[in-house]
Amino acid sequence: MSTRETFKISLLAKMPKDVINQFLSKDKTPFSVLFLSLLVGILAGLVGTYFEQAVHLVSETRTDWLKSEIGSFLPLWLAAFLISAFLAFIGYFLVHRFAPEAAGSGIPEIEGAMDGMRPVRWWRVLPVKFFGGMGALGSGMVLGREGPTVQMGGAVGRMISDIFRVKNEDTRHSLLAAGAAGGLAAAFNAPLAGIMFVIEEMRPQFRYTLISVRAVIISAVAANIVFRVINGQDAVITMPQYDAPELSTLGLFLLLGALFGVFGVLFNYLITLAQDLFVKFHRNDRKRYLLTGSMIGGCFGLLLLYVPELTGGGISLIPTITNGGYGAGILLLLFVGRIFTTLLCFGSGAPGGIFAPMLALGTLFGYAFGLIAKVWFPELNIEPGMFAIAGMGALFAATVRAPITGILLVIEMTNNYHLILPLIITSLGAVIFAQLLGGQPIYSQLLHRTLKNQKLQQQDLPPQSPNS
């Protein structure tokens, strides 16, 4: 027997048996949890992928109607207004009448559910978010489909737990988190970002165990495979592939990150302010709420005719920007304009997310920054498109406070793996400056606001009599 083998045997003999058994027992993941995670991922992938196709179908149908039947007996501007107003009305009505928790992104609802503070009524959230999101996003409003897919994915996870009568709370928690990861993986064709989003952004709520992490990974991979089978394996955003930038330009990426760090804190404040202003305006009165939402949707129908860059989630706008054709001044004007339209749509409580609008804002300012830097520093080999990609990750990192997720998300969406170093520098710079200014992550703010409103509503309820 060799000296090495003798040492191994003596070392194992000195270790308490309960320590060895405990270590091995931690690695015994129940097969049932893995199977249910796979099922959650497949269903979340189907829901997320077909939700995307449904939104595209509504948008294309709206455009076809304007080009043909309706445009023949109504003025084009009036037809555009009425169609988008009706689509928005569907979204707002379904939310207000059947599932108020389906308003907005939905990600804070999943985080609240993981903490045991919010219920997941999947039987009403799934249809309301799906069809309400079709209406709101199809109207041309500045909303993303990524938040809704995360909420619907989480709802799928809870649905599977209920259907299979899962009683173990840790398993139910793992399937809820797995559904959220699968939803994001299907929305962006980004499995790594889906996994990291749950592990990093939801870290205050996520219960870290071998089982829960494996469940999240399996679900995200399964959902992404479903997406690729249906939509193909191309990246979500088609744009130029860049080589690694010169080291002399890295300081500019850090400066861009600092600017986004400041803006991210301001942007988060404006989002919650917009939500509070809308609530004060409609006071949860259904008629006023629906009229306000319909008018907003109709206005975006008009904008689609004249300034389409200010409408929609923004994913289709990103490659248009990076292909050139816009000056820095126009890009900055669009940046300011889309800030306003994003706040208007998301603050109104429509069933839609903010991921895609944030990425579009990051692209607009980042590309404008790159164009300006190219003029001011002609001796440097500057590609403005690199700063657009870095801007996407930086704004995400500054607002969501999940830099690793933002980096992976942008890389997977654009296939620009050579830009990982500038993305890290820009994103970390954005997070550090945002923290120095004392800002809080956007989804934490939104969850806190939801829980505060829930507590106020409970206090307003009349006390029940002992005999009731």
From Swiss-Prot:
Show which residues sit on the Cytoplasmic side of the membrane: 1-30, 115-121, 165-174, 200-212, 280-285, 437-468
One Gene Ontology cellular component term attached to this UniProt record is: plasma membrane
Periplasmic side of the membrane: what ranges? 68-74, 231-250, 308-327, 375-384
Q: Does the keyword Mitochondrion apply?
A: no
Q: Where in the cell is it found?
A: Cell inner membrane
Write down the InterPro entries for this protein, in alphabetical order. Answer: Cl-channel_ClcA, Cl-channel_core, ClC
| GO MF annotations, alphabetized | antiporter activity; voltage-gated chloride channel activity
The protein's topology relative to the membrane is: Multi-pass membrane protein
Q: Which SUPFAM superfamilies match?
A: Clc chloride channel
| Keywords of the record | Antiport, Cell inner membrane, Cell membrane, Chloride, Ion transport, Membrane, Transmembrane, Transmembrane helix, Transport
**Segment forming the signal sequence:** none
| Intramembrane positions | 107-114, 175-187, 191-199, 385-399, 400-402, 403-414, 415-419
Q: Which family does it belong to?
A: Belongs to the chloride channel (TC 2.A.49) family. ClcA subfamily.
Query: What PANTHER family does this protein map onto?
Result: CHLORIDE CHANNEL PROTEIN
- Oligomer and partners: Homodimer.
Q: What the protein does?
A: Proton-coupled chloride transporter. Functions as antiport system and exchanges two chloride ions for 1 proton. Probably acts as an electrical shunt for an outwardly-directed proton pump that is linked to amino acid decarboxylation, as part of the extreme acid resistance (XAR) response.
Q: What name goes with this protein?
A: H(+)/Cl(-) exchange transporter ClcA
